Amino acid sequence: MSRVLECSTLVSVILTKVKKGLKKNTPFLAIITFNDSKYCKLLIDKCLELDIHFKHYNLYNPNTRDVTSLIDKLNKDDEITGILLVEPLPKNIDKYACYDAININKDIDGVNPINQYYLSINRPNIVNSTVLAVIKILESYNISLSGKNVTIIGRSYNISRPLASYLINSDATVSMCHSKTRDLVSLLKNSDIVISVTGVNNLFKSSDLKDGCIVIDVGLGDVLIDSDNISYTPKTKGVGPLSIACLLENLVTSCKKLK
């Protein structure tokens, strides 16, 4: 019988921890966006709810230098303890130059290559919030990673690749699939855990999976539930709200590092 991996309780636990951290720390978040973002609105609403200080920079038609200059200014501002670039960036922007520019201790979503490197050698500094959300879900349900076959669908720099590093460090055997992968269904059939990060609606079906498979749907709708043989995260009140909670936890951590 299928099981829904409920995340609301975990969100509450993490936000309680964040509130406790706010009693001893005063973080200040800089949010950089390039268009209207539902994610940004949810994040700002949560900052207002928790009385977290923030500045929102919505850049209109910027070039790469505009963005890196702003990041450099925020790096030098002692009041700012966390910097977040909200994806997607405009196509004319060199996003990797922007990632490089963020101070590694203000990089609350772990996009700077140095933070990714530290994670790859199992010495994490700051880890991407969505990666943390995935790991916390698995841990909260006592799902061991050691020796498991884990398939990640999607090869994004921000999420899929650091997630693969985290899983490998936890002794999982990891396959990363993408648009050029042949015979995805065969890989899925052999997977103990599937983590989908594509945002492609109904990319695969639960009937493609073996009995007892765990599905973490980061893309919010990647899996079509057409059987009752798996455990899976819900489309709403799942990975998304948990990622925001983990991001705010990272913000408090960054504030501590910068003291």
Feature locations, PLM:
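Anion-binding alpha/beta catalytic cores of soluble intermediary-metabolism enzymes, centered on
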Residues: 2-12, 16, 82-145, 202
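N-terminal ligand-binding/catalytic initiation module
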Residues: 1-82, 86-89
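Rossmann-fold NAD(P)-binding glycine/threonine-rich loop
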Residues: 98-116, 211, 216-258
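Generic structural signal for residues in well-ordered beta-strands
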Residues: 54-56, 174, 232
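Short hydrophobic/charged patches on amphipathic alpha-helices used for structural packing
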Residues: 68-72, 185, 206
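Conserved active-site and cofactor/substrate-binding residues in soluble primary-metabolism enzymes
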Residues: 5, 9, 13, 38, ...
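Glycine-rich phosphate/diphosphate-binding loop of Rossmann-like nucleotide-binding domains
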Residues: 34-44, 48, 125-204, 212-218, ...
